[in-house]
Amino acid sequence: EPALKPAVALSQTQHIGVMATRATLASTKFRALLASMAGASTFVCQPCDGLADAIERQDKSKIIALCADYTRAIGPFGTQQGEVDTVVLGCTHYPFAKAVLANLLGPTVQLMDNGEPVARQTRRLMGNPANGPGAACLTLLSTGSAGTLQNAADHWLAVQTPVDKVNI
């Protein structure tokens, strides 16, 4: 969600792809935001079933295959009228597939990672300055497999910290 507005500002063709989980695309908040921006751009929303799981499992061949399928469903890509020139990565897992996506889409397509907009919004909501005092602390929580998240954190983030399982 936080990357949609910057994507509209960045896009030259005003045709924007959105790769996200099915739950995100179906959420009331996302649908309302999309509706509020409907006149500004055309959005092609693609549910990416299984991509977050493949990233967590570090299954490179599955990541490549899923990214190829999902980008094919969004296209055509390019800088001409009616082509998608910007793709929003609407899940916190998807930046870990950014290199695969960039290779599939080519240099004319901009990938919008939602990490920076999410961090800005979090900082704003918390009311803390960007370089405030105090040490940072990383807490990992998972509703799924704690071991899977621990392995992913070790591989992708190079951090070894305990993972707590939570039930929602």
Positions of PLM-derived features:
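Non-catalytic structural scaffold of enzyme domains
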Residues: E1-I168
